[in-house]
Amino acid sequence: MKLTVLSENAVLYPGLEGEFGLSVYLEEGDTRLLFDAGERDACLRNAEKLGIDLRRVTAVAFSHNHRDHCGGFLRLAELLPPDVPIYAHSGFFIRKWWDHRCDPPQQETYSQTLELVGPPMEASWFFQQGLTGFRCLADDCIQIAPHVYLLGNFPAPGPEEAVHPSSVMEGPDGRLVLDTFPEEQVCVVDTPAGLVVLTGCAHNGIRSILSTVERRFPERPLQAVFGGTHLVPPDPERIARTADYFRHSFITCAGVCHCTGPMGLEVFAQTVPAYLPTGAGLVWQTPSFARTSAGRKEN
């Protein structure tokens, strides 16, 4: 398995473009999966510079509906064949906002403080573009290609990983409520070395999500994690607990990035031996050896 980061906040090599977003190109056998598409079009230009032909993409998956993860698809769509499978999760078209007051929701003041963050397109847009392969999934776990899975329907995180109160969504009655990110999904690749997990932002809590992955693949060890862990706005205690989780796990590569935030990245760099600096241009492949251990370290 090979992955290439096409779009991220940071760049690892001169000549590539950064943006606040995330896009990862995954190669596994004959599968060419684009996991998220960034905010604008950095993933397109970076792919060209990295020698990746996005017209060869065999499937697309969106981690959630925020524009920094699927906004770039508005420019990418014309490159793809109309029947390419495109996977979102149920709830993808629920409108989302960020409340800049960073306070618990107060309905009467929303209109003055909210920024619309997703989705950047409506359901009709896919059909107007002739993209007949678009699907909204409702599965806990679905295999979309050999060894490649999408997982959704995560349990609500505990109080230590609660969704930030500034994340709100449109409720069933049209009123705004705390966002539960029902559309969030992660990609899991089952390799001989263990499970490789790709996250978008892990709004439902990175520890909670990885624990769910372990429960759904009970015989397989976690080997690597790439993507956002949503440790912003920074909470030093939450960051420390998250770093401890990774440090005491058997995860051999922690390519946390994007919404992990500057403080989170610094703590990971200082305390997690498995941490791998991740940005646009990163190319990573699974090692050839197989791992048999599973679970977590005792200390």
Residue ranges and their predicted role:
Residues 42-93, 217-224, 250-253:
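Active-site metal-binding motif and surrounding structural segment of the metallo-beta-lactamase
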Residues 16-17, 31-59, 102, 168, ...:
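Pre-active-site segment of Zn-dependent metallo-hydrolases
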Residues 265-266, 274-299:
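Binuclear metal-dependent phosphoesterase catalytic core
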Residues 93-185, 277-287:
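Metallo-beta-lactamase
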Residues 8-10, 37-40, 65, 90-92, ...:
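Active-site metal-binding loops of divalent metal-dependent hydrolases
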